[in-house]
Amino acid sequence: MKRLLLGLMILVSAARAAPEPASIVGEWWTPGFNARVRIEPCGEAVCGRIVWLWDEVPKGIVDKNPLIGRVVIDGMKSTQAGRWAGGRLYNPEDGRDYKGSLALRSPEQLVVDGCVLFICQTQVWRRADAARCPPVAMPPQ
């Protein structure tokens, strides 16, 4: 009986010690540190907005609307630990929305896939380090 109780206590403590999957909520740098995107919960999904740009109006951008505050990740729902799908990704370079998915490669790297039919493009975003990158205030909407 004592062995059974000891075994159960070990199992319960091991289950509690298991790390929770990392969250994508927070701020992320796009490749080349050209933009910073804040990912936050929105209902049962997550959404992401541009909170900082290297250039206010980057060259080659089709969309002439302001990009700061623009939603670029919309409606991504968790499909399994470390993966989100079912939402849309907005590409300011061509002004189009794409079917997308997100996956945590590590707590510091987010793989962002955008697809049209069977043609996909992948980017790896880096988590913005809060110690070196203070929070960016969003403009009023």
Say what each PLM segment does:
Residues 1-7:
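Sec-dependent signal peptide recognition
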Residues 8-17:
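Hydrophobic h-region of N-terminal signal peptides that target proteins for export
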Residues 18-26:
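N-terminal helix-cap/turn-to-beta initiation motif at the start of protein domains
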Residues 24-25, 31-99:
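Central antiparallel beta-sheet cores of small beta-barrel/beta-sandwich binding domains
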Residues 61, 110-117:
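Short aromatic-glycine motifs in intrinsically disordered, low-complexity regions
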Residues 92, 103, 115-117:
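Short polar/acidic secondary-structure junctions
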Residues 106-108:
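Residue-level recognition of beta-strand termini and adjacent short loop/turns
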Residues 116-141:
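Edge beta-strand at a domain terminus
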